[in-house]
Amino acid sequence: MRVTEVFDKRKMHKRLIMMLLIAAVMVLGITGCGKKKDSGSNGKIDIVCTIFPEYDWVKEIIKGEEDNFNLTMLMANGADLHNFQPTADDILTISKCDIFIYVGGESDKWVHDALKEAVNKDMIVINLMDVLGDRAKEEELVEGMQGEDEHEHHHDDEDDDDHDHEDADEDEHEHHDDEEEEPEYDEHIWLSVKNAEILAEYIEGKISSLDKDEKRVETYKKNLENYKAKLDGLDKQYEEAVKAAGKNTIVFGDRFPFRYLVDDYNIKYYAAFIGCSAETEASFETITFLAGKVDELSLQTVLTIETSDKQIANTVISNTKDKNQKILTLDSMQAVTAKEADGGKNYYDIMATNLEVLKEALK
């Protein structure tokens, strides 16, 4: 099973939807030229973020100067990044903003088409994965992990061999070439406190470049300095906790979006699916493998993400020898709504809570 196949079924559908949305926006007859904002005189700086972590980082940077901004979180209802499709209104909002911030992974392929209709030709576009550069990680299938539609793809391959082996080999060769040219990257870059520091600093630089008021710019820079100090302190707490832990491996009865987090602190993991997977049912082999790892490593917990129904985790536990492990939840921040964010939910607190969960999992 190749990781690149995870997205194959979604691409054509998403592309068709985007074409229809772009056509709808064009029918609305958007006209006019974009201009850089002179914040505080000609208008506010419009910033559009796709997901919650970006939104929260911007809030931290502009703290005390919020009245000079229009800040929008596109996935305001807690929609998952992997399933999100922008509406015509979303595309209109993006087209007129001053700064647009998005992750830049496979799930954001719609952005390219949306930006073609930008009214503001001076828009600053921030692709966070591009900002990270070599820190962005390719998706990986670790031992025991179930590939997307594993059994279905296996049967399809058998049919190809039976009916047209030569064509199948040719398709496989072409697909392999595509894989080498365009590897799939793990999109969950925000689940690293170290990455958050890098990305927040870059975002602050772009915000400051748009504001002509020196005092406000000083505020942004001071806010960033304070925020980075908090994140750096949390990073050190993670390092100390992992060093003091009795174990160094976690088992996830779920999809696994925490690659960046565990890699930061050299934590090993086993999981049912990769982070971008749409699978909800684990195979017998996957369940058996994960349960075996829980027994082998004498683990007292099985972990899930915040939106899990815990069915896989419960099944893993029921297949262990002791059958008494606890289920813990790590929050991947993929279901936070704008209302929750505006009500006080924030990136730092969530990552601090994740640290406490991790401490218990590594006992």
Tell where the protein language model's regions lie, with residue ranges.
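Extreme N-termini of proteins with methionine-enriched Sec-type signal peptides or N-terminal signal-anchor
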Residues: 6, 12-13
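Extracytoplasmic metal-acquisition and chelation regions
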Residues: 2, 7, 18-19, 29-363
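Sec-dependent N-terminal signal peptides
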Residues: 13-23
